[in-house]
Curated annotation (Swiss-Prot):
Belongs to the lipase/esterase LIP3/BchO family. Residues 69-296 form the AB hydrolase-1 domain. A lipid is attached at residue 19 (N-palmitoyl cysteine). Gene3D superfamilies: alpha/beta hydrolase. This is Lipase 3. It comes from the Bacteria. GO terms for biological process: acylglycerol catabolic process. The active site is at residues 74, 142. Keywords: Cell membrane, Hydrolase, Lipid degradation, Lipid metabolism, Lipoprotein, Membrane, Palmitate, Signal. It is a lipid-anchor. GO terms for cellular component: plasma membrane. It catalyses: a triacylglycerol + H2O = a diacylglycerol + a fatty acid + H(+).
Length: 315
C-alpha cells in the first residue's frame, strides 16, 4: 500500500535530484524500493554504456523491442525516472530513457560540455550502439526538449517525430515573471539548503504530489552536494539558444508535438507561440492547471495526447 501511495511522489523527487548516497539510510532504501516497483511496473530494465569518452551513460529500456524506438530525455536536475511512471502508458513503443551525462547514475565530469549539441551527440552514440539510430522518435522535457531539438537538427534524416514538453532553449520568448532577475546566486533551481529544495518542489509543479518531509530531506542533500556541477550546467544551458536549429526541423517537416502546462513558472507558456512560428507544422497542446512537468503531474492525459499524435502519423 505504501508503494502505491508514495510511488509517484517519491519517483518525481528522485527524478529532480538523482539518488546515490544520503544520510538517512531507511529513507533511501524505502525510496529505492518504490522506484524499483515503478520501473518493474513499466517493464523497465536499467542498463549502461561506456561512451567513447570513457564516461558511463546509464539508461532504462523496456522490453518492447518490436516497437519503434522512442528516446525520452529528462530536464535539468532530473534523470531517467522522470519518465518511469508515464512509461507504463507508453508500452506500445520501444523506450530508451537515459540519464544524461551529469545527472542520475551517469558520469558527472566537471569539465564536460553540457550544451544541447554535446548531449545530443552522446545520445546518438547510445542509439547507434543499440542499432536504433534510424527511424527514431525523440521527446524531451525542459532542458531535454532543447536537447531533442538539437538531436533532430543534427540527424534530421533519422528522426520520425519530435515531442517537446515545456521545452527550454527558445530563449527569445523571454522568462516568466517568477524568474525575472534570477541569477546563478538566487536561482530557485539551484539548491543550497533543504528549504531551497522544498520551495523548488512547489515551484516546479502546480499541484505537487505528496512526499514525506524526511524523504525530501534526503534528496535535498543530494542536490546540495551536486550544486557545483548543477551551477556549471545551468550556466551553459541558459545561454544555449536552439531557435536556429529548430529551423532545420521546419525545413525537413519533422512532425512535432508541443505540450505545455499553462501554470508553468519555469518556462513561460507563451513560448509555444514562438515555437509555432519557427516550426509551422508543430501541433500545440496547452494543458490546464499543469506546471512544468506534465508527464509527472498529468500522466494519463499526457500519454493519451502523445499516443493520439503518434496514431495521427499513421494516417
Amino acid at each position: 500500500m505504501l508503494l502505491k501511495r508514495l510511488g509517484l511522489a517519491a519517483l518525481f523527487s528522485l527524478s529532480m535530484v538523482g539518488c546515490t548516497t544520503a544520510p538517512n539510510t531507511l529513507a533511501v532504501n524505502t525510496t529505492q524500493k518504490i522506484i524499483q516497483y515503478e520501473r518493474s511496473k513499466s517493464d523497465l530494465e536499467v542498463k549502461s554504456l561506456t561512451l567513447a569518452s570513457g564516461d558511463k551513460m546509464v539508461y532504462a529500456e523496456n522490453d518492447n523491442v518490436t516497437g519503434e524506438p522512442l528516446l525520452l530525455i529528462h530536464g535539468f536536475g532530473g534523470n531517467k525516472d522522470n519518465f518511469t511512471r508515464i512509461a507504463d502508458k507508453l508500452e506500445g513503443y520501444h523506450l530508451i530513457i537515459p540519464d544524461l551525462l551529469g545527472f542520475g547514475n551517469s558520469s558527472k565530469p566537471m569539465t564536460a560540455d553540457y550544451r544541447a549539441d554535446a548531449q545530443a551527440t552522446r545520445l546518438h552514440e547510445l542509439m547507434q550502439a543499440k542499432g536504433l539510430a534510424s527511424n527514431t522518435h525523440v521527446g524531451g522535457n525542459s532542458m531535454g526538449g532543447a536537447i531533442s531539438v538539437a538531436y533532430a537538427a543534427k540527424y534530421p534524416k533519422e528522426i520520425k517525430s519530435l515531442w517537446l514538453v515545456d521545452t527550454a532553449g527558445f530563449w527569445s520568448a523571454g522568462v516568466p515573471k517568477s524568474l525575472e532577475g534570477a541569477t546563478l546566486e538566487n536561482n530557485p533551481l539551484l539548491i543550497n539548503s533543504k528549504e531551497d529544495f522544498y520551495k523548488m518542489y512547489d515551484f516546479v509543479m502546480y499541484k505537487p504530489p505528496y512526499i514525506p518531509k524526511s524523504v525530501k530531506a534526503v534528496f535535498a542533500q543530494e542536490r546540495i552536494n551536486n550544486k557545483a556541477l548543477d551551477t556549471k550546467i545551468l550556466e551553459q544551458i541558459v545561454t544555449d539558444n536552439v531557435e536556429e536549429r529548430a529551423k532545420i526541423i521546419a525545413k525537413y517537416n519533422i512532425p512535432t508535438l508541443v505540450v505545455w502546462g499553462d501554470k508553468d513558472q519555469v518556462i513561460k507558456p507563451e513560448t509555444t507561440e514562438l515555437i509555432k512560428e519557427i516550426i509551422p507544422q508543430a501541433q500545440v497542446i496547452m494543458m490546464n492547471d499543469v506546471g512544468h512537468v506534465p508527464m509527472v503531474e498529468a500522466v494519463k492525459d499526457t500519454a493519451n495526447d502523445y499516443k493520439a499524435f503518434r496514431d495521427g502519423l499513421k494516417k
